Amino acid sequence: MGKKKNKIAAVSVPDLFGKGITNVYLLVMFGLFPVFYPGSLIGIHTVKKEFFTISAGVYLCLMLIPFLCKASFVFKGKERKKIDRSDIFAGLFLIAALVSTGIALNQTEAVYGNSTVQTGLIVMLLCIGSYFFVKNFAVWDKGLIWANLLASSFIYLCGIFIACRTDILNMQKDIIDAQKAMFVSPLGNINFNVAYISLVLPAAAVMFLLCKEVFTKRVLAAYLFVGFMDLFCLRVDSAIVMILVVFLLLIYFSFEQETWFLRCLSVIGLFFAANIAVFILSVLLKDHMYPFNSLGTLFVRIETVVLEFIFLCIFFVMQKKGNFTKERLWKGQKIYKITMFVLLGLFVVFVLALNFAFSERVEGTLLSNLVLNDAMGSGRGYVWIRTGGRFLDLPFLNQLFGCGLGCFYDFINPWYDDMVAKFGAVFYDPHNDFLQVLVTTGIVGVVGFFGMILHTMAAALKKRKNQEMFLAVFILLAAYLAQGLINSYTIFSTPILFILLGLANSSMGNTD
């Protein structure tokens, strides 16, 4: 009997140590990593890379003891270890990252990254290592949720204040005036902020649907309102694309329960109220607020605000007097699904028609953003067209494993002079997650990277029937993929993504 107790202790002590260290690491990454900056946003890419490298490096070193203990028990047959598909996809991405470094266009940048794109091999190895250790040792804790809410709220408030040309923390002190509208928080560029927000705000929206405590519900309502305000203040199209996908999914799943449906109306109402608040700020502050452009201009028009106010009134009446039986909600979900598929089909036909028949007629209008040409998406079309064309001309080995992490600049360099002449700058990434992964780690890397995400989404969708909170995993990953259509992964969001994938798979594994 004594020997049995000693064996249990031998197993549990390293395991408890691993869980404790992992919890501290998660608190650091969720609570400190997003908000940390050295007093200025100059060189913020390098600062974030160093912060993550040190934090993850120390974490992985400390985790060697519990990992080796756990591995020894698995090797001796005292403990069974199941390798799921997410691990296989992570392994594929790891192989692609390693091989791509060996055949990289610039091996130094492939290993270390460059001054703008810091996601070189070292960072990716730390991300993948974090994923595996978090997946095996993480224990979900309410403290992590609060740390995440506080840190992301700080990011939102920074974005709102700076959009109003009010830098209360003097973060922009060394940034030239022409760039100040772009750098709005300790996460730097507005597009980097959207990538981070896609990993936190959608989860809060789902939590609002599910929560039962009145206090938590009120906190989440305030959090969502501020987060939505920041999305508008970022003035970037990727934020609109991301939140549109979130709402389309949220509405669909909300039909499953009357409480969810009514709370979904509240979330949409908070979104409209946030837009009205931003509109009022734009009227009151006028020139003291950075101007809106592209799709953002639609949300600061009086017609949009009036329409939103009408919808708020309708939602209020629906919540007070609506009679949403289970049968009505089921029919509503069915109609909604059919309508969305029809609209999606019509949208695809519309986009194809614009590109092949009416591209010249819509030039200079908002619809021109749907036409694939050099001017599309603030120059994104330029880099997308050339990226796709050059990738097809690469040697077969590079098509399989890529040109090296951090090497997109070298990949696109043949158009250096042309980019400087047309845009006054050079593209360091393709502003598209798929193209970024494809160029840097090849087809194998694409299968591994997106396989991890899609498998986790599929597992979350399946598990949510028994554990409703997994719906948050599905929607936030969908939101990340949506904004990734216009943005590329960066040092600001990639570590958080891999940690969330590990945390999600850990939680889902514990429910088996």
Predicted feature locations:
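Transmembrane alpha-helix boundary signature
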Residues: 65-81, 100-112
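Cytoplasmic-side transmembrane-helix entry/capping segments in multi-pass membrane proteins
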Residues: 83-91, 263-269
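Aromatic-rich transmembrane-lumenal/periplasmic boundary elements in polytopic membrane proteins
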Residues: 114-118, 158-172, 341, 352-407
